[in-house]
């Protein structure tokens, strides 16, 4: 069986194995106080064009999401996010478990717009009895979204302005950051994210690392006691240098960006094959996740050779499925899938 079900079904890019092997004889202090984490943070600061952000390395993305929210909010504040947001649908109530309410907003192709956030914030601040409500304080979005779509620079700028107007934090989940940056339609850079957000992260687990996410704290207000929140929530890895080594290895020569861009290009080949067969897209994605609508017969035929993800069933019985390429997907695997799509 050929896997197109996710972007974390191989361990790590070969350059990471080579770096780990070369470093095997060395030893380091624990908990991120090592030279690899320092070097990785320096690489990230070069990429974002700023020296002032604080950078912390997490083992996983769910940990990054709930620690950021826990550290940013007090007990009467809440998170605003798309209805389809990862923290709302795929994290087992981790945000709610920190004691914070999620205010979900209707999403269009996985995104929420500045006007929606404005309406949410203004309804709170203009409410006659706001003391009986939670204050919407942090806006959570992801880049790319759960459906592989991406925010334009203009959309991010508008969200940034609204957040500043109402004193809200803008938090960008970047678990698939490489695939978003590598999309052919993308006009957002890491430097833009460092200017427009209060906190964001560069994902490693889904983008070539064995594990790990690099959280970039831009807003000074979020830095105080942040590592204490990490430790309190089990997010500080004792062997922290393994995180730093991986990020330094992937970022120092652009490997992170080249391998994720290739996965996007492979996904577009799959997208085009479905187009040729007049099979409808569910969302207009230009990243490594492609969502299409298949008949039961088409789904059964492809599932004989490929593993892909069922996202939902439409009222007429057709299936919404996801085909996901990754940094480890081979051209041969894509060639086979394209041929079988065209043979449907």
Q: Would you name each region that the model predicts?
A:
Residues 99-144, 151-158:
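PLP-dependent aminotransferase-class I/II
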Residues 102-103, 170-172, 281-282, 309:
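Hydrophobic beta-strand scaffold residues
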Residues 71-89, 118:
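Conserved PLP-anchoring active-site segment centered on the Schiff-base-forming lysine
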Residues 75-76, 268, 273-342:
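Conserved C-terminal alpha-helix-loop-beta "cap" of PLP-dependent enzymes
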Residues 108-109, 135, 142, 150, ...:
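Active-site C-terminal subdomain of aminotransferase-like
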Residues 151-183:
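Catalytic PLP-binding core of fold-type I/II PLP enzymes
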Residues 14-61, 83-88, 94:
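Conserved N-terminal alpha-helix of the aminotransferase class I/II PLP-enzyme fold
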